[in-house]
Amino acid sequence: AVDALQVAESLDLVAEECSPFQDIANNPAKELALVLAEATPLVWGGSVLAARASRRVAEQLRAASGRAALAADASELCTVVAEVPRRDLFADPFVDPTSTARPAVIVLDDGDETDEVGHDLRMLENTARDHEVRVWRTTHARGSVMERYVGLLHTGRFGAAYLRIALGHDLD
């Protein structure tokens, strides 16, 4: 059975962590918005509920930025990341701006330490590193499965709201 009080307390903690009054160094939602300011989000969650949260977060990021966002299994994201062209160290973004933003892998970690999730995470992180794609992770590993789910979901939703503000869009 889900303990509604515990879930509500988890939501309160996320609201405190992601408060506009929190410095960016201590605010995972603001950090997420900065990571995605000029990036295309590729969102991954390893467990069933983290994967569900990743789809919801991707929807929020897509709505906030007007850009494509993808939530998928690690193997599918690795295929996308493997096709990312290498960075040109000598490219001048002001002279030759690229038409598409580089991707950033967003990992929603609910503390699931099964072998399959660990393998998928390592595969995704290694592929991203090999192709110079940034990886950003948020973790909510304490509490019940539902508490971890809402922690990941709402950190992503706060991040999407900050991204929307940073990009100059109204919060309608």
Language-model features, listed with the residues they occupy:
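A SIS-like phosphosugar-recognition module
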Residues: 1-16, 20-172
